[in-house]
């Protein structure tokens, strides 16, 4: 049975913290014409070429050795999913901690949702991000990285829109009518952002949103897939 974690995330710990390796890979989904730029964090023994990644005005970065060789086998696999106008750095504070504790972590810039690409119209076409996650999992498990991860221990962690994606992987559906009724009743900033885009969604696109679950059979078939939706601490 699929295990789902929604309320909290309990990080595992190890006797000693590992050094972090980081790699960059681009995965092209030719069927959907989507290029997904990824960063992979993982435990390594290499520290000689460490540099600082993902530092900004709000958060300290983390030290990692670029293109270092991963160490260990059967590491839990974590897929991090950013929110609207976010990017791979947003959850790097968490990804780096997980990697230090022995996890293999994949963070990505999800096209049409990421910094510089997201618009109200593109974000409402929310069925693509869950498909991106499913595609990424397949790519990792069929790559050279597969030797380092436990295919039966996979967790998806999402923030904001990424939180919806994690829930969608569990079968959640976006209720457009309910959202429009909410916006009619309350003066929410998100309603202003999406108002025109909601009105312009075609009937086919509305059906795509309501049927997101049917596009995720690959993820649903993974009995150990865990899903975490978060709504706190983000940086751009």
Cite the ranges covered by each PLM segment:
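Residue in the alpha/beta-hydrolase core beta-strand immediately N-terminal to the catalytic nucleophile
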Residues: 153-155, 227-229
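The conserved beta1-alpha1 loop
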Residues: 76-83, 232
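Catalytic nucleophile-loop/oxyanion-hole region of alpha/beta-hydrolase
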Residues: 85-97, 114-135, 147
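Domain-level recognition of soluble alpha/beta enzyme cores
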Residues: 19-78
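Gly/Ala-rich beta-loop-alpha elbow adjacent to hydrolase catalytic centers
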Residues: 158-162, 166
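Short amphipathic alpha-helix adjacent to the substrate-entry channel of hydrolases
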Residues: 70-74, 86-109
């Amino acid at each position: 049975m699929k295990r789902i974690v929604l309320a909290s995330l309990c990080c595992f710990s190890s006797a000693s913290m590992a050094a972090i390796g980081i790699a960059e890979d681009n995965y092209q989904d030719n069927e959907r014409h989507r290029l997904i730029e990824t960063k992979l964090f993982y435990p390594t023994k290499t520290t000689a070429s460490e540099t600082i990644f993902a530092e900004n005005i709000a958060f300290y970065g983390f030290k990692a050795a670029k293109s270092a060789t991963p160490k260990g086998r059967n590491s839990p696999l974590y897929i991090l999913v950013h929110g609207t106008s976010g990017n791979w750095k947003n959850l790097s504070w968490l990804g780096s901690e997980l990697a230090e504790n022995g996890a293999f972590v994949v963070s990505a810039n999800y096209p049409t949702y990421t910094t510089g690409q997201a618009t109200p119209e593109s974000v409402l076409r929310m069925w693509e991000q869950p498909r991106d996650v499913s595609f990424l999992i397949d790519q990792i498990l069929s790559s050279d990285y597969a030797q380092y991860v436990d295919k039966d221990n996979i967790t998806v962690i999402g923030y904001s829109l990424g939180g919806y994606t994690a829930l969608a992987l569990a079968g959640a559906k976006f209720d457009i009518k309910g959202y429009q009724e909410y916006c009619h009743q309350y003066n929410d900033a998100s309603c202003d952002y999406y108002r025109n885009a909601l009105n312009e969604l075609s009937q086919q696109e509305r059906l795509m949103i309501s049927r997101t679950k049917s596009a995720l059979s690959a993820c649903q078939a993974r009995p150990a897939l865990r899903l975490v939706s978060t709504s706190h601490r983000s940086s751009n």
